[in-house]
């Protein structure tokens, strides 16, 4: 994409074929006690147990955010919320600055996880992209559910101008085998995405090694929108917030990592099929 460095963000042309881009991330962390943590930062987030995520991944460039996480019942339950501010790749139509700013949008994510034991984990995900700009009024405040760090509050915005996504994730660990599954749902288009994977830990009794096979698929309308939602795409600066392929695809991947004494090998193989 012109004017964009993939995985980094805004870029300017440098000489004939080069690009000049900057990357800065970090966070401030505050924990009033052992079970509560707050963060103010500029970075990315990832949800799930797989190599990919169909809900929120670290593929898109960094963005400013505020987050809080809370452990309950001897850390068997974790609740986390992330409030962030992102941008579309389109610029504000009329601007007083030499270079028009990108159209802003507000995003928030709520995650409720339960780990009754060290082998099983189950989570519920809720995400929303909120309208923060209007061509007539400029920047506007998003709907009230954006400010509520309560899972389930975004149900109020289904069939609205906001883009709401729900998801479900679970994993089960055996002795050295982990199976996991993730489901993404778009209530506005009745579409879904599915992930299923198996990860073999320490194969051949080699430390720091694994072998992972994963399957991902998403319907072509998973992140579809109507005309009112064009500024609320599930993306940031032209990058998908979830799987890099967005929607309308099937993918199977095999990756692994092996080490022996001073030798080390890591690989990733994948095959994809796009359907629009």
Please provide the spans of the model-predicted regions.
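Exposed, low-structure sequence patches enriched in small/polar residues
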Residues: 21, 116-276
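Outer-membrane beta-barrel channel domains
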Residues: 1-121, 128, 203-220, 225, ...
């Amino acid at each position: 994409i012109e004017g964009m460095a993939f995985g980094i963000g805004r870029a300017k042309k440098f000489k004939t074929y080069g690009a000049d881009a900057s990357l800065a991330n970090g966070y401030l962390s505050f924990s009033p006690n052992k079970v509560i943590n707050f963060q103010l930062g500029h970075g990315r987030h990832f949800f799930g147990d797989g190599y990919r995520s169909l809900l929120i991944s670290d593929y898109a460039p960094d963005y400013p955010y505020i987050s809080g996480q809370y452990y309950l019942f001897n850390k068997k339950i974790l609740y986390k919320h992330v409030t962030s501010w992102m941008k579309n790749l389109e610029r504000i139509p009329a601007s007083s600055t030499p270079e028009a700013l990108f159209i802003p949008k507000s995003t928030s994510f709520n995650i409720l996880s339960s780990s009754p034991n060290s082998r099983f984990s189950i989570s519920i995900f809720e995400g929303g992209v909120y309208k923060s700009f209007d061509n007539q009024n400029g920047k506007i405040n998003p709907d009230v559910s954006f400010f509520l760090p309560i899972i389930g509050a975004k149900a109020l915005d289904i069939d609205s101008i906001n883009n709401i996504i729900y998801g479900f994730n679970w994993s089960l660990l055996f002795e050295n085998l982990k199976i996991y599954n993730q489901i993404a749902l778009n209530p506005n288009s009745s579409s879904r995405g599915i992930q299923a994977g198996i990860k073999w830990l320490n194969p051949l009794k080699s430390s720091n090694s694994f072998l992972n096979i994963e399957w991902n698929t998403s319907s072509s309308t998973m992140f579809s929108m109507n005309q009112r939602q064009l500024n609320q795409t599930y993306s940031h600066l032209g990058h998908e917030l979830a799987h890099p392929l967005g929607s309308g695809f099937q993918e199977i991947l095999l990756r692994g990592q092996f080490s022996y004494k001073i030798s080390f090998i890591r690989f990733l193989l994948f095959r994809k099929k796009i359907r629009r």
